[in-house]
Amino acid sequence: MAEMDLVAELPPPEGAARWAEVMARFAARLGAQGRRVVLVTSGGTKVPLEARAVRFLDNFSSGRRGAASAEVFLAAGYGVLFLYRARSAFPYAHRFPPQTWLSALRPSGPAQSGKLSLEAEENALPGFAAALQSYQEAAAAGTFLAVEFTTLADYLHLLQAAALALNPLGSSAMFYLAAAVSDFYIPVSEMPEHKIHSSGGPLQITMKMVPKMLSPLVKDWAPKAFIVSFKLETDPAIIINRARNALEVYRHQVVVANLLESIQSSVVIVTKDSETKLLLSEDEIAKGMVIEEKIVEDLRSRHTAFICDKH
């Protein structure tokens, strides 16, 4: 299978075996509690153009959807394994850009016993106290685990390890595949070893297609799980057909289809026999509601029905 060959070809990230053990323990502990667990993938991958990489082809994604969704899943009682691009949006923290902290926080007094106390006006970081409390509660309960990736190779190895960790949970596991994964890569055997120099003239690169990892995920790594993929398009005339084609090819449960122009306010939940449009009203937007709240609410209901159908 081309997908498995690619995972074997690409070098694993440093600490891959350790992370596989950590994820397996996380899933087993929450599974023993009877808790559902969701893997949320978030952010974009990048592929190196040289073996000693200086240049990369990067799939940009802020990771905001994955981070916001992770928060809603935690609030709904799920354990969340958050596989995210380093330095992309992080649950709770993404609402507060670092530059706002510099003007909002100030020392409240001299440091004592190695501790620094900070204070801020309540309106300087609106919502910060509640976000901090939610994050710390999840950390204390052991229901949140964050694992970083950077390159395509990192992502594929860690995705496989995460899937194998969640596989024993059967239908109680959900995969929420919101990461923007590279479509092209250069095989290791075809990479130049050193930095590509501009003195050589215009650059021509031949890249191979990255096989879709939905196939081994559905068939081999976690065949009993509830699997959700995402489809982003710019043409409304083709988006539903492309979502349905993905369901037919990979045989998973749900595609969340969204158009670039309305990505933060509207999606369509597509299954093999239904289409459900989720839309934020102007009032909901004014109140600060995010579309991920509606997405997760819908998927949680579908996941419940999926579990009941399997038992």
Predicted regions and their residues:
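A cross-family phosphate/adenosyl-ligand binding-site feature
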Residues: 1-311
